[in-house]
């Protein structure tokens, strides 16, 4: 990408989802970057979805695309009432409706039983170890969360929070202003 184009690209965010015991937590940083400039340091990229707020969600990618992905997923969740079914139905729409195209965003969603990554191209992925991370600092957060899970007795919320903090120390597009929610 040319440097003139690069200066107009939004870089955001790091999201991590951690399961331990009967708890699941999703954490995200608060930084939104345009080119080489931090535009906002306290953005909220983690929220609750569904009628009773029993689904956690966090997004990374282009903000407008992420909000579109949120809305599409939440509509499926309202209609079907179950996380996995809503994700599969959304993926089916991608395969049949050309108008959806390609959204440049990723969504992590979790309820008490399941964690999923939903991509802006209609892919649905379930992590095998209960830990998933997306976004610019996702690799760092994933590594940190896996190490903390393997070598400590910390709870899901603390692991998620610490993983974002560690990613924020390494990734220039991630800060340590953490928002975390837990079921």
From Swiss-Prot:
Gene3D superfamilies: Glutamine Phosphoribosylpyrophosphate, subunit 1, domain 1. Allosterically activated by HslU binding. The keyword Oxidoreductase does not apply. PANTHER family: ATP-DEPENDENT PROTEASE SUBUNIT HSLV, METALLOPROTEASE TLDD. Belongs to the peptidase T1B family. HslV subfamily. Protease subunit of a proteasome-like degradation complex believed to be a general protein degrading machinery. This is ATP-dependent protease subunit HslV. The lineage of its organism: Bacteria, Pseudomonadati, Pseudomonadota, Gammaproteobacteria, Lysobacterales. The gene is hslV.
């Amino acid at each position: 990408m040319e440097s003139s184009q690069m200066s107009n690209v939004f870089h955001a965010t790091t999201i991590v989802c951690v399961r331990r015991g009967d708890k699941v937590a999703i954490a995200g940083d608060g930084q939104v970057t345009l080119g080489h400039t931090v535009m906002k340091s306290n953005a909220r990229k983690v929220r609750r979805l569904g009628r009773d707020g029993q689904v956690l969600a966090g997004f990374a990618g282009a903000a407008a695309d992420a909000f579109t992905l949120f809305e599409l997923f939440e509509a499926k969740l309202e209609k079907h009432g179950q996380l996995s079914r809503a994700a599969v139905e959304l993926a089916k729409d991608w395969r049949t409706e050309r108008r959806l195209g390609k959204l440049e965003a990723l969504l992590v969603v979790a309820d008490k039983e399941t964690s999923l990554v939903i991509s802006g191209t209609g892919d649905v992925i379930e992590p095998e170890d209960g830990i998933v991370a997306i976004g610019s600092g996702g690799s760092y957060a994933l590594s940190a969360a896996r190490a903390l899970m393997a070598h400590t007795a910390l709870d899901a919320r603390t692991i998620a929070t610490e993983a974002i903090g560690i990613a924020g120390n390494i990734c220039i597009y991630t800060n340590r202003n953490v928002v975390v929610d837990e079921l």
